[in-house]
Amino acid sequence: MSSKSLIQSGIVLLISIILLVNYLIFFSKNDDSVKINEAEIDNNVENKILELKYNAVDADGNSYIIESNAGKVSDKEKNILILEQVTGIIKIQNSEDIIILSDFANYNKTTLDTYFYDNVRLKYDGHSIDSDELFMNYVDKNINIRNNVRYKGLNNKLYADIVEIDLVTKFSKIYMLDNQKKVKVELKQNGSN
């Protein structure tokens, strides 16, 4: 083999090695960048459910309907839905419907327990209770209303820390957390105060 052919073969081999090294360095890094970007995109995706409605009926014929403008599954517990602009309707046999409104709620799809929060309002047969929080235990048929509770009835107003309601017996317990404080009651006289 002549020295001219040997030099040409060496140059071709050198160019091939340079191209291979460049390919491995630059193209493998681009693949990693694309994978990282895809992972960042996946982390930023939020799954929202729009116009959500659940309806549950127990063995006694009582029902609970919960509706929401939007919601998503909790990152921490897959049975919990975090809902926005929520309406809950409780229908107990031989009783008036109870309507609960709130800005947000955490709804357990398995137990039907619901924690309503932010601008909560409960309406029932001419009665209205506003608060910051309301917890409804559907199985036990009770409601616990707390934090900044304001009740308004036909002839009175009431301010307390906690109101507990048994939905079956209609028994209510109203009290303050601090025993030194009293529940504040305003009575209307002759239809006005």
Predicted regions and their residues:
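Mature-chain termini and adjacent capping regions
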Residues: M1-N193
